[in-house]
């Protein structure tokens, strides 16, 4: 298992209830595929560096996880499909 940092941006028009459900759904995708979530940070609504689909803001979420590649691949696949996630990135943390 390796350490990863995942950041994703949720569309700003999503209601708070739906946003929480989306966060729980993607956390579930990771844990159901064998990942262990170490830390979750909600940065909240922030201005984007550039417009994405005519939107200037988004809700930022950051996860630190211990995971295998299968869980990361499944998260990546579902994040690409979901229209409420504007962007996402998965970074493998270097071992010290």
From Swiss-Prot:
Gene Ontology MF terms: small ribosomal subunit rRNA binding; structural constituent of ribosome
Record bears the keyword Plastid: no
Keywords: Ribonucleoprotein, Ribosomal protein, RNA-binding, rRNA-binding
Highest rank taxon of the organism: Bacteria
Gene Ontology cellular component list: cytoplasm; ribonucleoprotein complex; ribosome
InterPro entries listed in its UniProt record: Ribosomal_bS6 (IPR000529), Ribosomal_bS6_CS (IPR020815), Ribosomal_bS6_sf (IPR035980), Ribosomal_S6_plastid/chlpt (IPR020814), Transl_elong_EF1B/ribsomal_bS6 (IPR014717)
One GO term (biological process): translation
Record keyword Endoplasmic reticulum present: no
NCBIfam families named among the record's database cross-references: S6 (TIGR00166)
Protein family: Belongs to the bacterial ribosomal protein bS6 family.
Function: Binds together with bS18 to 16S ribosomal RNA.
Protein name listed in UniProt: Small ribosomal subunit protein bS6
Record organism: Bacillus mycoides (strain KBAB4) (Bacillus weihenstephanensis)
Record lineage: Bacteria, Bacillati, Bacillota, Bacilli, Bacillales
Encoding gene per record: rpsF
């Amino acid at each position: 298992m390796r350490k990863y940092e995942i950041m994703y941006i949720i569309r700003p028009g999503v209601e708070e209830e739906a946003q929480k459900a989306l966060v729980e759904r993607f956390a579930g995708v990771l844990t159901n595929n064998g990942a262990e979530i170490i830390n979750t940070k909600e940065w909240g609504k922030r201005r984007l560096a550039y417009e994405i689909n005519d939107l200037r803001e988004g809700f930022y979420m950051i996860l630190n996880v211990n995971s295998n590649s299968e869980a990361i691949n499944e998260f990546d696949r579902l994040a690409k499909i979901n229209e409420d996630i504007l962007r996402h990135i998965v970074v493998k943390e270097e071992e010290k």
